[in-house]
Structures are given as structure tokens and as C-alpha cells.
Amino acid sequence: MKIVGLLSGGKDSCFNLCHCVLNGHEIVALATLAPTQGKDEIDSYMYQTVGHDAVHAIATALDVPLYRAEIRGTALNQGAVYGERDPTKECVSSLEDETEDLYRLLLRVKEKHPDIEGVSVGAILSNYQRVRVEHVCCRPDLRLASLAYLWK
């Protein structure tokens, strides 16, 4: 399956990409969310931003395009459940929630690479991240499989 790798620049997102390749998937693009210009790190429930400035080097090494977006939202919906349980219904979360930044980024990647069917995710122990990534992936205009080989 052709996939996009969500990449923070950290070891977990990179290691998960290795697992994707070992499982026969083809990385066709990378995507990253970074702090607004002038900030190196932000306090985010959803995103690791410490290594965001090195992500371009990984994309160059893999010879795949890199899609970047700024993290504009904040963690408005901090509950265990995100949005509607039925992914065919419109998300009831605020457009200002940081999770929606991921949705907009993946939508942009999917428009450029309509053959992408999955997303590599380096989440290990965070149900908070897993629930939100899965919610975004199963929206009708994306329909992507979440590939989190490192999960627990």
C-alpha cells in the first residue's frame, strides 16, 4: 500500500516508517506539522515539535516530497473521545482544535497523491493521539488506514 509518513523528526516516527517498509508498504510522501514561524517548540497534547527542523533532511534522504503545515489550533477537545463516533458524520469538534490541522494537512497530501491508502504514525502509548489520528483517517474524504506498528 502507498502511504504518507507523519514525521516529527523523532525516533518513533522514523522507526515506524521502517516497520511500514518491512511490511511491504511504499512511502510516497512525508507530512509534518510544525510550530508557527519563530517558535521552536510548543506545548501540544498532539504533536512533538522538538525535531521539526530536521524533517526536511529525512525527506531528502528518502527522496520523497515533504508537506508541511503550521500548528494553528490548540487542544480544545481534550476528552477520551474525539468528535463523532460515526466517521461519516461531520466532525463536531471546533475547527480551531489542533487535530483539525492534521486533517487539513492530510487532505492536502491526499489531493496531490490520491493513491495513498495509509498513514504511518509513531504514536506508542498515547490513546489521546491514537484516537485523534484514527478519527481523522476514517473521514469520508480521506479513508486512510492508520499504521502504528509501535503501538503498545
Named regions from a protein language model:
Residues 1-152:
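ATP-dependent adenylation/nucleotidyltransferase module used to activate substrates
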